[in-house]
């Protein structure tokens, strides 16, 4: 099972070093059981998304350790991967970025051909082979259709629940 991390510093730019590297249950420590990829995403001082990821376990990834110590942001998303769908490769490592939003997912969504048919031209947002990135593309499409983030998320989750075999749709 993948592991998710999300943190908001509110109005303040903060570091996530403790939770990513130093805590007894840090993502680096948990990656010994979830070794298939590590990523961290945040936003720079101008609100632009930044994503750093490798198809390596966090405890082995020197760049992850450096990023965890140096990055300062109001919002962090991090993910360690236990691959269920898609190869162990950079393009399948979370978090993903679409239209200036970041996304990481824990769970399994099946019947990807049905999801791809539903996505239509939005499938062009997908660069890897994971169910997660396709799920994010559906959320992105629904947000763009209605212009409301909350309603877009609800609409996408409802479509997935109604049409696809799902084991979990947890995401940050």
Placement of each model-derived feature along the sequence:
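Short acidic (Asp/Glu) patches
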Residues: 24, 55-66, 78-100, 117-121
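Catalytic core of PPM/PP2C metal-dependent serine/threonine phosphatase domains
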Residues: 146-172
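Small-residue-biased structural context
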Residues: 13, 69, 122, 144, ...
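Conserved beta-strand-loop-short alpha-helix elements that form
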Residues: 2, 101-111
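Extreme N-terminus nucleophile/cap motif
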Residues: 1-57, 76
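Fold-independent oxyanion-binding glycine-rich loops
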Residues: 7-10, 79-82, 106
